[in-house]
Amino acid sequence: MAWLGSLDLHYRPDPDAPAAALPRTIGRGVHSGPLRVLQSLYPEGPGICHHVLVHPPGGIVGGDELALTAQVDTGAHALLTTPGATRFYRSGGDAALQTLTARVADGARLEWLPLETLVHDGARARNALRFELAPGAEMLGWDLLALGLPAAGERYASGCFEQSIEVRSAAHPLPWLERGVLDFDDPRHAPVTQRLLASPLGWAGHTVLATLWFASGTALASARRDALIDAARAPDSAAQPGAEPLGVTAPHDHVVVLRMLGARVEPLMQRLRAVRGRWRRLAWDCAGAEPRVWRT
């Protein structure tokens, strides 16, 4: 049986907060089906609402459709994460669909920090992320995509997986669009997919792709962009082997992007967490605090 689920989230400052106090970010959610918020947490104080998103069935299979929307109002700061990996399982026919549409208002902040996405062999799925930033809005997000289960001898060699990451702003319609298709189902596309995964211009034989980005609804000053790039390139004494960035760029003056490839999730995730902490301190003067659920 396919699961149909939706979750609509809304974050706003508490209108009843004392004028001299840091406004509390209130997070509310309305859900249908299995997708829901575990609870609202405030480990950094009242101004930043941490939400842990859960999907009790534990994975996404053919025919499932999950839709998440988030609205972050002016003055609010929301951090969204998950307690475990998002898994797209093998499908016997129908494709699965997961979508996120987030709108961030002027003066609001959003952090989109889910744990890794695992795409099993034979999965047929589409994962679409869209972020709409008003002038003055800012966000920090990441995506860690892992193909198959190499440690268990499972290669991703069949199925079709499509993913898109889209950042829009009122100042510029499309500062950044990332779209990738890995299609083994169509015999016309399968050879192209094989070359993409093997080529040094593509995945270079790796099975894990990590992406971290900082984006603004207003063009970032060149000094600020350069500082974010330098912070991402800084050596990390605690980094595990295979976790060095392959590229840190500003493809548009609204966004800075870090990219890594690797054979395992853990070293890349460790590096993402380290750079995310640096960017958070640099851009927002916030401590590099991490959600507690990552330590469980």
Swiss-Prot record:
Q: What are the record keywords, sorted?
A: Chaperone, Cytoplasm, Nickel insertion
For this chain, one GO molecular function annotation is:
nickel cation binding
Q: Which cellular component appears as one GO term in the record? A: cytoplasm
Cytoplasm keyword on record: yes
Q: Which Pfam families match?
A: UreD
Record localization: Cytoplasm
Grouped into one coarse class, the protein's main location is: cytoplasm
Asked if Chaperone is a keyword of the record, the answer is yes
Report the record's disulfide bonds: none
Q: Which InterPro entries match?
A: UreD
Q: What does this protein do?
A: Required for maturation of urease via the functional incorporation of the urease nickel metallocenter.
Task: Describe the protein's quaternary organization and the partners it interacts with.
Answer: UreD, UreF and UreG form a complex that acts as a GTP-hydrolysis-dependent molecular chaperone, activating the urease apoprotein by helping to assemble the nickel containing metallocenter of UreC. The UreE protein probably delivers the nickel.
Q: What is this protein's name?
A: Urease accessory protein UreD
Q: From the UniProt record, report the name of the gene that encodes this protein.
A: ureD
